[in-house]
Amino acid sequence: MNTSIRKPVTGSVSDIRELCVVNSMKQNFSAGAEHEVHPPFQTGVIDIGAHTVRMDLFELNRSWQAEKLESLSRPFNLGADVFRHGYISVENISKLIGMVGDFCDRIREYGGSHYRIVATSAVREAFNKELVIDRFREAGLTLEILEGTTEVTLTYQAVREALSGNCNSALENAVMLIMGSGSLFVIGVSRGVMCFCQEMQSGTMRFNDALGSSEHPIEQLRRQLKSQRVIRLLDEAMCREEKQPVSLVIVGNPARKLAAMCGKSLQHENDCTVLDLKEFSDIIDACEHHHGKGFGKIDPDEAAELSAAAVIVRHFFDSLPCREIICPGMTTRGAVLRDWVRRCRMPGVDPFRTDLAAVCRAIGRRYDFDGCHALNVASASSLIYLKLRPFFSFPEHTGLLLEAASYLHDIGRFVDFRHHHKHSWYLLSNIRLPGLTASEHRIVAAAVRYHGRSLPREAHQEYSSLSADEKVAVLKLAAILRVADALDITFPEPECGALKLSLRGRVLHLIVDESDLSSMKYSLKVKGGLFEQVFGLELKLQNGE
């Protein structure tokens, strides 16, 4: 399990052709390539949260099935540092490294040589997070900070896989709450695919850490949940009718604690339990209003965490027509392990593609996009990419990035038609797409920025701020996107089935079933220049009749 972090390539070359030649080798924008490994072996995942550092030690058998050998945890409050002051103190960095080092020693005692150290909300939001990574590196440890979009995607996929056996219909129409002490992820699932995802700074201990108990953190949490209007956004994205019932899926350590108070113990990641609605409602009411009192001896921090978790669940439980509440046993460590196993067993396969497309379509509807046009462009860009892929190098997940850019390239028209490409870039830069890394997100936004007539220039901050690898990716994606957009000028149908491609020599023949090609030829002449510069191919439009 490789924990190395690839250093970003920096630098810029203004000339498009030179930039493409310099970076002609295969590009990889994933979290990191995995070493080839063969089970059985022991491995571990160390998770640095806002309040606790946890380690799970697993053994993978020859069939890649995981058995948990040991779990360790130590309380360590990073949230008070980050959410109150914005950084992690030097003293706490040293303590954290020592604690993680002890966990690594424990993994090695089992004979494990592959392990992964990940950090979530608190370290992710610290302005000195790069210093934390550097200090870990100096100690011989490699720390990976999970971006919010990565964390939610891994957890969602792992929960979906775990529920597929025991609660198969739970994620047909559902709202999933991934609760941590530092952050809250809200996911909307419609017809079995994710269509909404939002990270909220509403973790169960966040207001306690930021304000202190004297500032009534529970009331602050209630106000924030109401002000976010997340229920309305969920309804819009899910196209949910007013009284259509949903499953409420609660995930995370606070959720498992609430389930345990109902007598439901979740020992394994694959476990899940359906909670009795009346009993669970009474439990969260007691936690919410009595701060955990009456449940025996309980640590004040744990009581505060349970109260906040109850407030969060109550907000969604009262606002949605919940037919059931389900709590799976999945953890961040289990989700990270499952993702790594999948990458090793099925490299290049992305099970999240359908969900990302659904999220993009929901965002497009929010900004009144032309769904037929977006689908046409997505279909055409995919055909062009597949035709070019054997002959040119592309970033990992190019098909995924092209699909996202195709669906969202015109959302800026919601603001202004004339400069919609710039507004599309701005809107995308302020939207977080699950399943994409920060680098991939920048690539998609910049490709959308240049889907119109203007070419990328170093004078454009949105282009000059990219790394050299990212610039090449943007050029290739934008070049394909412009051609696909031009081809849709006269397509009357919501699919690009009439488009056929033929690559002969240095000419890419675009064959369409249209009698009048004049409008399409003009559009292609205006927008096809970048494609010819980037790929060195002439575009030739012809009638297929």
Predicted regions and their residues:
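A short amphipathic beta-strand at an alpha->beta junction
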Residues: R323, F535-E545
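A structural preference for short, hydrophobic beta-strand core positions in alpha/beta folds
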Residues: I117, I145, C327, L541-N543
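N-terminal glycine/serine-rich phosphate-binding loop of ATP-dependent small-molecule kinases
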Residues: N2-G44, I48-V53, F58-T120, I133-E144
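Short secondary-structure junctions
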Residues: I489-P494, V534-L537
